[in-house]
Amino acid sequence: SEGKHIIVERYSQDGRLTEALNYNLDSLNVIDHMVVNGLGENEKATLYKNNLLPFNSEEEVTFASKFSGFVDSTLMLLEKNRVIMDTLSLEVFSNKTEAFRIKENASYTLLNPFTEKEQRQDLTLYYIFAKGFGLVEWYDEANKSHYKLEEILSQDKWIKMLTR
């Protein structure tokens, strides 16, 4: 309904779908945000701000979404602010390519509407996007979690992995 789009899905280590973002291909703005709630059901989140990808180093973009929390009757508010930190040259699968690093300040706020209590967790993440590949690396500020693209799976291989 809003032109061509692309859906990016996130999975847990055990292969369960946890989140999906539906991007407009022309603007790269988020059209829809889906999360899997505490009952294991797909739920459409409420989008307040829909931009996750800055286009230049002067731009700061904001994404904000609200959805059911993982505990009964709670709500989760997700807020992300992103800027391009720098550009770099790196090697991806033996190909030297241009890339840019994004810094993300994220806050996850768990809201209980009955007790009016809030629990907030802030974190800083870094994402590296390489020309011709997309997202190739991401890590947290303390480098406790660091992920790097090691293989691009074919559709058949991905399906086989999920159906084991």
What is the role of each PLM region?
Residues S1-R164:
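Conserved functional acidic sites
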